[in-house]
């Protein structure tokens, strides 16, 4: 359970940073366009001081925004959280595989204990590497898992990818 939750939270945090990056770029482009327009207006009409003042204010805002967002490398933050989400997903799948092998009886008790220890060590290592997330990412993950059932796959969805003879719900 924890692996699935942590995976989804990391995924949602990566989405947040992606959206922040997109909005930041749009704002930067918009302000750059306004600054350029103001400079062109000054060149065309050198006598109007309003263009000069407005352009100076926009340029100052642009500089402030650029300096502020230089502190945040949203692309790198997004990448880090995506990579961590994948690590948690792989760990969850490894636990699922262990449970399947236990149910199938293909592992001895010693093998189960050894694999469980290995997975626990991986869990500890990944936990140490996992970056902190926001409360918003947690809430979006909660909605995705509890309400939207993001991690639940129906038999119908599984059957789509199987050959006809392996499907549970044959047509």
Regions found by a protein language model. Name each.
Residues 47-58:
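Hydrophobic alpha-helical transmembrane segments
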Residues 31-47:
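Juxtamembrane "helix exit" motif at the C-terminal ends of alpha-helical transmembrane segments
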Residues 33, 64-67:
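Hydrophobic residues within the alpha-helical transmembrane core of Major Facilitator Superfamily
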Residues 45-49, 105-106:
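Short helix-coil transition/hinge motifs at the ends and kinks of transmembrane helices
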Residues 56-63, 83-89:
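Hydrophobic alpha-helical segments of small multi-pass membrane proteins
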Residues 1-30, 68, 72-171:
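Conserved non-transmembrane functional hotspots
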């Amino acid at each position: 359970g924890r692996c699935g939750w942590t995976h989804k939270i990391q995924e949602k945090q990566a989405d947040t940073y992606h959206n922040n990056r997109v909005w930041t770029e749009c704002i930067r482009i918009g302000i750059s366009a306004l600054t350029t327009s103001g400079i062109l207006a000054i060149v065309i009409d050198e006598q109007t001081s309003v263009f000069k003042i407005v352009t100076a204010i926009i340029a100052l805002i642009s500089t402030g925004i650029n300096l502020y967002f230089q502190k945040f490398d949203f692309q790198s933050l997004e990448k880090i959280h995506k990579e961590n989400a994948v690590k948690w997903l792989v760990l969850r799948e490894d636990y699922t595989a262990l449970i399947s092998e236990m149910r199938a009886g293909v592992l001895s008790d010693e093998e189960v204990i050894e694999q469980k220890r290995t997975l626990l060590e991986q869990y500890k290592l990944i936990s140490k590497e996992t970056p902190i997330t926001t409360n918003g990412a947690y809430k979006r993950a909660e909605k995705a898992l509890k309400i939207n059932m993001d991690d639940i796959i129906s038999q119908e969805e599984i059957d789509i990818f199987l050959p006809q003879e392996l499907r549970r719900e044959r047509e």
